[in-house]
Amino acid sequence: MAIGLIGRKVGMTRIFTEDGTSIPVTVIEIAGNRVTQVKTLETDGYRALQVTTGTKKANRITKAEAGHFAKGGVEAGRGLWEMRLADGEGEGIEVGAEINVDIFADTVKVDVTGQSKGKGFQGGVKRWNFRTQDMTHGNSLAHRSNGSIGQNQTPGRVFKGKKMSGHMGAEQVTTQNLHVVRVDAERNLLLVRGAVPGATNGDLIIKPAVKA
């Protein structure tokens, strides 16, 4: 897996090309990602980089977190994220190093992972795009009902994974192959074409596209 960065969704806007074409873009702020730990095959059984970004109030940091950050000589951030490394990736990156948005300077497309907006408890029509039942013709109570959820004595149960009403959203979602429109290293900004998962100010993981 390629090295990615942790960013924050600022919001959406649009930019214009020289010929006047309007391009909808999402602005992602990628402050310096500080390496807090480098995991190796010898010590951990796999290769990975653990990073943090941003800041966190001192009274919100646990003793375990404080010790972990102090061991790496890194300022405490708002969280910890880990990215697996393939053979040959991340060579020369040490604890305390800072990775910035300019690593995407030559990247054409990226995959963006975030937590989708939570929508609470929803029915089958909204959650799974079920078709509604008749509004009339004798139907007076079950317009948006899910309908049958199984059979009879055989199998005598509801199969796991059956699409039913329940909590919708607030889950990890990845949008693939978003075109990189602009990299602003001076202001730590990355502009990608289109929308990305999650609400404004939500954390995002940005990696070079695997299917590009």
Curated annotation (Swiss-Prot):
GO molecular function: rRNA binding; structural constituent of ribosome
Keywords for this protein: Methylation, Ribonucleoprotein, Ribosomal protein, RNA-binding, rRNA-binding
GO BP, one annotated term: translation
PTM info: Methylated by PrmB.
Alphabetical list of SUPFAM superfamilies matching this protein: Translation proteins
One Pfam match: Ribosomal_L3
Top-level division of the source organism's lineage: Bacteria
GO cellular component term of the entry, any: cytosolic large ribosomal subunit
Positions carrying N5-methylglutamine: 153
Entry function: One of the primary rRNA binding proteins, it binds directly near the 3'-end of the 23S rRNA, where it nucleates assembly of the 50S subunit.
Similarity comment text for this entry: Belongs to the universal ribosomal protein uL3 family.
Subunit structure: Part of the 50S ribosomal subunit. Forms a cluster with proteins L14 and L19.
HAMAP family the record matches: Ribosomal_uL3_B (MF_01325_B)
Name this polypeptide is given: Large ribosomal subunit protein uL3
Lineage of the species this protein comes from: Bacteria, Pseudomonadati, Pseudomonadota, Gammaproteobacteria, Alteromonadales
